């Protein structure tokens, strides 16, 4: 493994590059060809909402000197992994109850495995991508690449001093393309960078690194700017149906194609700006970063799924689902979605939680993350109103005498707790005065 990362361009060898068609990868591909490598371009179709023509990207790669260029359709796998994350609640980052749905880590898990698998088919065993040394993706792609191909070598132009010296900035890269006969016009540089896939979009860096810069500078690509009062957003009632943990219907329409299901969920949630959040998070290397996120479809499914979870499962099961979800979310974020410890956690939730989740949830969506749940229907509900009805009911499951017995049994642990508080008070750990929060204990 010591020579896994190549710091210099491997001359005369096949080098696979994850090619987006943007300035960085275009310049890198042309530069590698001119310097003597044999570049192969691989583009992942992840259903990116900001990409208009996927088929044009491989053609562009060929023009820049790729020996071969392939478009890999990753959408179905990405949708399935998104559903798995919903089933497991694999989300560990939230602020004020608003969740980040780990959409970029899910995209990297799919891209990192499927592109490297495609490279193996072409006998390409060296891989490069555009991730920087300060971010999470460099480690995610490293892990997923080596899991897929243990013989893989990693070459990144952005870690090559020669490439940095010659083409170290956007201006230098654009001039390089122009000098080689390509009519490249630099796009207007935004105040932040955006990365997206079918599950969600990430906006970060540049102006967004300043915490005094709010969400309002972001132009959403998956929905509306719900904070803009000039944007008309009408309340909308939506019904989501799950069968054995899998979303299958939206507003009574059944979707056999999981990709189309997600696209429709994105359209519905996007009309309201549902699923947008502003998060400060810990990167893999423990430094904090800030991101603005969109995930309208994931948010819609998550809300409906968790409503059914709370109506169907008991308290201990829900607790384990949430604890395991936090752990699994962090593993996913770290690029460990297919590691044994993650598979163990996934198995428990996908088998013992998700399989019971069948039913429909009706919601009213308003602006942003403002919504109401209007109805919850499932043949598996353990919620039964008559069990705890405040009205008099026939054949009640328990009566006052039963509750007296249950409360009497509590005397055992109340007595133990009282004794422990006395011990702590005598040890000086608690103050049992008249103004103390701890109840006055009196004599033992």
From Swiss-Prot:
Pathway note: Amino-acid biosynthesis; L-arginine biosynthesis; L-arginine from L-ornithine and carbamoyl phosphate: step 2/3
GO BP terms, alphabetized: argininosuccinate metabolic process; L-arginine biosynthetic process; urea cycle
- Locate the residues binding ATP: 18-26, 44, 130, 132, 137, 195
Cite the EC number: 6.3.4.5
The kind of enzyme this is, by top-level EC class, is: ligase
A molecular function (GO) held by this record is: ATP binding
Quote the gene name from the UniProt entry.
argG
Task: Give the primary localization class.
Answer: cytoplasm
Family statement drawn from the similarity comment of this UniProt entry: Belongs to the argininosuccinate synthase family. Type 2 subfamily.
Instruction: Give UniProt keywords alphabetically.
Output: Amino-acid biosynthesis, Arginine biosynthesis, ATP-binding, Cytoplasm, Ligase, Nucleotide-binding
Q: Which CDD domains match?
A: ASS
Q: Which InterPro entries match?
A: Arg_succ_synth_type2_subfam, Arginosuc_syn_C, Arginosuc_syn_N, Arginosuc_synth, Arginosuc_synth_CS, Arginosuc_synth_type_1_subfam, AS_cat/multimer_dom_body, AS_multimer_C_tail
Pfam families, alphabetically? Answer: Arginosuc_syn_C, Arginosuc_synth
Which catalytic reaction applies to this protein? L-citrulline + L-aspartate + ATP = 2-(N(omega)-L-arginino)succinate + AMP + diphosphate + H(+)
- Fetch the NCBIfam families from UniProt: argG, PRK05370.1
Task: Summarize subunit and interaction data from the UniProt record for this chain.
Answer: Homotetramer.
Query: From what organism does this protein derive?
Result: Mannheimia succiniciproducens (strain KCTC 0769BP / MBEL55E)
Which residues participate in L-citrulline binding? 100, 136, 140, 193, 202, 204, 281
* Residues annotated for L-aspartate binding in this entry: 132, 136-137
> Is Chloroplast a UniProt keyword of this protein?
no
- Asked if the Swiss-Prot or TrEMBL record annotates the protein with the keyword Acetylation, the reply is no
One cellular component term from this protein's GO annotations in UniProt: cytoplasm
Protein name (record): Argininosuccinate synthase
Compartments reported by the entry? Cytoplasm
């Amino acid at each position: 493994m010591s020579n896994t990362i190549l710091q210099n361009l491997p001359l005369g060898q096949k080098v696979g590059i994850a090619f987006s068609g943007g300035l960085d990868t275009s310049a890198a591909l042309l530069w590698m060809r001119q310097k003597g490598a044999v570049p192969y371009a691989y583009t992942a179709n992840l259903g990116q909402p900001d990409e208009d023509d996927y088929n044009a990207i491989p053609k562009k790669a060929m023009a820049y000197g790729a020996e071969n260029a392939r478009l890999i359709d990753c959408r179905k796998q990405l949708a399935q992994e998104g559903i798995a994350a919903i089933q497991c609640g694999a989300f560990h980052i939230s602020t004020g109850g608003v969740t980040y749905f780990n959409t970029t880590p899910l995209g990297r898990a799919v891209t990192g495995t499927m592109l490297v698998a495609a490279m193996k088919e072409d006998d390409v065993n060296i891989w490069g991508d555009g991730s920087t040394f300060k971010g999470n993706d460099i480690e995610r792609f490293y892990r997923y690449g080596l899991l897929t191909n243990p013989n893989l070598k990693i070459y990144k132009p952005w870690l090559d001093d020669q490439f940095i010296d010659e083409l170290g900035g956007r201006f230098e890269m654009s001039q390089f393309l122009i000098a080689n006969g390509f009519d490249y016009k630099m796009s207007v540089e935004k105040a932040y960078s955006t990365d997206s896939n079918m599950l969600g979009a990430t906006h970060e860096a540049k102006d967004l690194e300043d915490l005094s810069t709010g969400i309002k500078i972001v132009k959403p690509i998956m929905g509306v700017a719900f904070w803009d009062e000039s944007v008309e957003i009408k309340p909308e009632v939506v019904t989501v149906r799950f069968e054995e943990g899998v979303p299958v219907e939206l507003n009574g329409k059944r979707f056999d194609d999981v990709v189309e299901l997600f696209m429709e969920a994105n359209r519905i949630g996007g009309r309201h700006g549902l699923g947008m959040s502003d998060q400060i998070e810990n990167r893999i290397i423990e430094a904090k970063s800030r991101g603005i996120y969109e995930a309208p479809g994931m948010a819609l499914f998550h809300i409906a799924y968790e409503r059914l979870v709370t109506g169907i499962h008991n308290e201990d099961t829900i607790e384990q689902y949430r604890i395991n979800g936090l752990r699994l979310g962090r593993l996913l974020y770290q690029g460990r979605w297919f590691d044994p410890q993650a598979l163990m956690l996934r198995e428990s939730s996908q088998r013992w939680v998700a399989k019971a989740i069948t039913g429909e949830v009706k919601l009213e969506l308003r602006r942003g993350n403002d919504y109401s749940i209007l109805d919850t229907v499932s043949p598996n509900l353990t919620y039964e109103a008559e069990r705890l009805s405040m009205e008099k009911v026939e054949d009640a499951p328990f009566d006052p005498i039963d509750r007296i017995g249950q409360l009497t049994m509590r005397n055992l642990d109340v007595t133990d707790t009282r004794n422990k508080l006395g011990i702590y008070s005598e040890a000086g750990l608690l103050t049992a005065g008249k103004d103390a929060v701890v109840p006055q204990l009196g004599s033992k």
